[in-house]
């Protein structure tokens, strides 16, 4: 047993990845000027993951999203031909938002200001009192398109008028590793949202390492991700994948809820290594869990994986399915956080009970994390400390900062990806 656990933590990943081992400045968490550079150099040039295409399964389905970091409101819709398209949700007349609902189905979109009407392919088809306009041509006044691509069911957009690289080039080795994953229950998300008084990276950091779990989450999931053999929750695996990164977290295979915790003991899933991250025994999970990218070490002591899709999304895998974390910056010190948990429909009362237990525990853990990052942001803003000191199991945070530094300084996206 000790020989197996001795190999849990990747050794020298920081050095092998060519990363510095020195302190990391906190300036990017608190500087309005650095945030302005991130807006232009990162978020306006990178491919941004918005969600799953299952959110708009039918022709005419649409969703709208605020992308505050780019001062944009985006309309994503599915055409009659089944293609996913994206547009700036801005009327060609005088700039009003055309669609005010967060989601729905429509063959046409009518701006509420003056009833200018657009088909869901973006073309302008109706203008009241059109003859009173001067030298007017509807063909030149459609909704402004946004580059959009779907990869493995994930919808990405690029807000640059002409993206400098394709989505496939942007994803790089991440796309190779994650290709072909059969995502279970991708059309059934449970959504958790919160506006947080913290820089987006401060929140993201909390999900890029497991070092804090035995301490911060001692009363919730601490003993799920740590054990006497692995008291500091060392990782099973860590990989730097171009601009992106993977962490695979240890799970205590001998975890059992305390006798006093009768609710969790009642719902405990004895078929998984980490009961609080497992919520179903759906057969669809079998092929998902067998995929090489899910639990890549195929360890029996596994809790979850976290794939960080640069810059702002984590896709997490666990024994019971998958979930995402989105970190949308709203200012240099505020973030709109969104989590989506994809769980299969419960086949039994016991499975439904475990799902409810999973969500309630997830909310508990999120509250611990989000309260802590707000305190962390205040600490950084005090400027009492100018640097962070990161250890080996925080390598993903270091890699994120290295990647951001390249993007902020690079004159082209291809240079940033090199």
Predicted regions mapped to residue ranges:
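Short Pro/Gly-enriched beta-strand edge/turn motifs at strand-loop
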Residues: 45-51, 57-58, 127-131, 307-311
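Short, contiguous pre-domain boundary segments
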Residues: 9-25, 184
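Generic structural signal for secondary-structure transition and capping sites
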Residues: 43-47, 96, 212
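C-terminal catalytic domain of Rieske-type non-heme iron oxygenases
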Residues: 83, 89, 149, 154-418
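Short linear motifs in intrinsically disordered
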Residues: 51-58, 136-138, 302-306, 340
């Amino acid at each position: 047993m000790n020989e197996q656990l001795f190999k849990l933590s990747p050794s020298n990943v920081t050095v092998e990845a060519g990363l510095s081992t020195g302190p990391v400045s906190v300036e990017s968490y608190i500087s309005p000027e650095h945030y302005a550079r991130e807006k232009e150099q990162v978020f306006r040039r990178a491919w941004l993951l918005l969600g799953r295409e299952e959110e708009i399964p039918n022709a005419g389905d649409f969703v709208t999203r605020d992308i505050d970091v780019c001062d944009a409101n985006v309309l994503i819709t599915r055409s009659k031909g089944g293609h996913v398209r994206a547009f700036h949700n801005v009327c060609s007349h005088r700039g009003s938002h055309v669609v005010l609902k967060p989601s729905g189905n429509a063959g046409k979109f009518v701006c509420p200001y003056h009833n200018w009407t657009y088909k869901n392919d973006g073309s302008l088809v109706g203008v009241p009192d059109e003859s009173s306009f001067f030298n007017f041509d509807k063909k030149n006044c459609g909704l402004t398109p946004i580059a959009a691509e779907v990869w493995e069911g994930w919808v990405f957009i690029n807000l640059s008028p002409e993206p400098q690289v394709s989505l496939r080039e942007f994803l790089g080795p991440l796309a190779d590793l994650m290709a072909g994953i059969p995502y279970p229950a991708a059309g059934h998300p449970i959504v958790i949202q919160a506006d947080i008084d913290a820089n987006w990276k401060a929140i993201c950091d909390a999900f890029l390492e497991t070092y804090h779990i035995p301490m911060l989450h001692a009363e919730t999931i601490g003993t799920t991700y740590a054990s006497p053999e692995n008291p500091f929750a060392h990782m099973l695996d860590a990989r730097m994948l171009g601009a992106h990164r993977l962490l695979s977290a240890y799970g205590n295979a001998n975890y059992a809820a305390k006798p006093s915790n009768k609710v969790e003991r009642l719902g405990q899933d004895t078929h998984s290594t980490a009961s609080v991250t497992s919520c179903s025994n759906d057969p669809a999970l079998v092929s998902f869990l067998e995929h090489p990218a899910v639990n890549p070490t195929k360890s029996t002591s596994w809790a979850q994986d976290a794939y960080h899709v640069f810059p702002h999304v984590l896709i997490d895998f666990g024994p019971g399915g998958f979930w995402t974390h989105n970190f949308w910056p709203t200012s240099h010190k505020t973030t709109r956080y969104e989590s989506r948990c994809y769980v299969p429909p419960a086949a039994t009362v016991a499975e439904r009970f475990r799902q409810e237990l999973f969500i309630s525990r997830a909310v508990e853990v999120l509250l611990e994390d989000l309260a802590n990052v707000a305190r962390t942001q205040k600490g950084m803003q005090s400027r009492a400390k100018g640097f962070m000191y990161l250890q080996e199991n925080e390598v993903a945070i270091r890699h994120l900062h290295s990647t951001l530094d390249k993007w902020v300084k690079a004159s082209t996206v291809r240079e940033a990806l090199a």
